Swiss-Prot record:
Pfam families: tRNA-synt_2
Official protein name in the record: Elongation factor P--(R)-beta-lysine ligase
Catalyses which reaction(s): D-beta-lysine + L-lysyl-[protein] + ATP = N(6)-((3R)-3,6-diaminohexanoyl)-L-lysyl-[protein] + AMP + diphosphate + H(+)
One Gene Ontology cellular component annotation held by this UniProt entry: cytosol
Protein task: With EpmB is involved in the beta-lysylation step of the post-translational modification of translation elongation factor P (EF-P) on 'Lys-34'. Catalyzes the ATP-dependent activation of (R)-beta-lysine produced by EpmB, forming a lysyl-adenylate, from which the beta-lysyl moiety is then transferred to the epsilon-amino group of EF-P 'Lys-34'.
């Protein structure tokens, strides 16, 4: 029998034991801080509208639903957790499976483990500090450094991402030999994301985790726009050793503005020939009922474990990656 028979786990048993210890450590971290662990559905009748996320879709055909009901596997537990927050649950965290019909490789698996938590009455900076505490505890790393999105572009690409026009962004892309992609791209945010991925990410978080905060307002997603600078959103990401670990927001609480953003996403999807997605009315109703002022973050657990173990690939820390599922 082949030594690489696909019935065998992707990860070694010693690595899976270490993974279990890290999961227990994460739970202790939140238990010590009085944060409630919750569970929410893996499937929903609505899904994300973000043009860069691709959910799995299935169909329920049980009794009473002879015509079938479209369901989507959750790309993150965010919407359901916000409904719990609006219902008065207080600070919460969740370790759960999430699903994205996208990449597969060293740092990606279509099914993955997400750690997501929400802190009422925390601003973005206070939550960044808590993320830093968790990373130091699990990874035994140095305290993180922080750069604004604008500072990161100015340092590594010598361009201001908040004021540069598309011509200037394409010129910056040309210096990275990316003209073949950039010259035909008309969406400014896609150009910015290309430059960030190829021109900024390789240079940050090498020795210690790096927070990038205050993303452009056009990339706010579900984050508030900064009251100090309306060009930027109260959003942050965390990078370490070439890997994006987490994405956090000072959460938007305005139901009307959130609906407008969802609708704008769907217009962008239509313009790109992508299917428009059903908007989560339950989330909008929860925001209208009163989501407390809060900040939240989603962190990729498989990537965290990979870094903690010094592994080369997610396959080294996941029992069965999709090619063995």
């Amino acid at each position: 029998m082949s030594e690489t028979a696909t019935w065998q786990p992707s990860a070694s048993i010693p690595n899976l034991l270490k993974r279990a210890a890290i999961m227990a450590e994460i739970r202790r971290f939140f238990a010590d801080r009085g944060v409630l662990e919750v569970e929410t559905p893996c499937m929903s009748q609505a899904t994300v509208t973000d043009i860069h996320l691709f959910p799995f879709e299935t169909r329920f055909v049980g009794p009473g639903h002879s015509q079938g009901m479209n369901l989507y596997l959750m790309t993150s537990p965010e919407y359901h957790m916000k409904r719990l927050l609006a219902a008065g649950c207080g600070p919460v965290f969740q370790l759960c499976r999430s699903f994205r019909n996208e990449e597969m490789g060293r740092h990606h698996n279509p099914e993955f483990t997400m750690l997501e938590w929400y802190r009422p009455h925390y601003d973005m900076y206070r939550l960044m500090n808590e993320v830093d505490d968790l990373l130091q505890q699990v990874l035994d790393c140095q305290p993180a450094e922080s750069l604004s999105y604008q500072q990161a572009f100015q340092r590594h690409l010598e361009i201001d991402p908040l004021s540069a026009d598309k011509t200037q962004l394409r010129e910056a892309a040309a210096k990275l030999d990316l003209s073949n992609i950039a010259d035909t791209e008309e969406d400014r945010d896609t150009l910015l994301q290309l430059l960030f991925t190829m021109g900024v990410e390789p240079h940050i978080g090498k020795e210690k985790p790096t927070f990038i905060y205050h993303f452009p307002a056009s990339q706010a997603s579900l984050a508030q726009i900064s009251t100090e600078d309306h060009r930027v959103a109260e959003r942050f990401e965390v990078y370490y050793k070439g890997i994006e670990l987490a994405n956090g927001f000072h959460e938007l609480t305005d139901a009307r503005e959130q609906q407008q953003r969802f609708e704008q996403d769907n217009r962008k999807r239509a313009a790109r020939g992508l299917p428009q997605q059903p908007i989560d009315q339950n989330l909008l109703d929860a925001l209208a009922a009163g989501l407390p002022d809060c900040s939240g973050v989603a962190l990729g657990v498989d990537r965290l474990v990979m870094l903690a173990l010094g592994a080369e690939s997610l396959a080294d820390v996941i029992a069965f990656t999709v090619d063995r599922a």
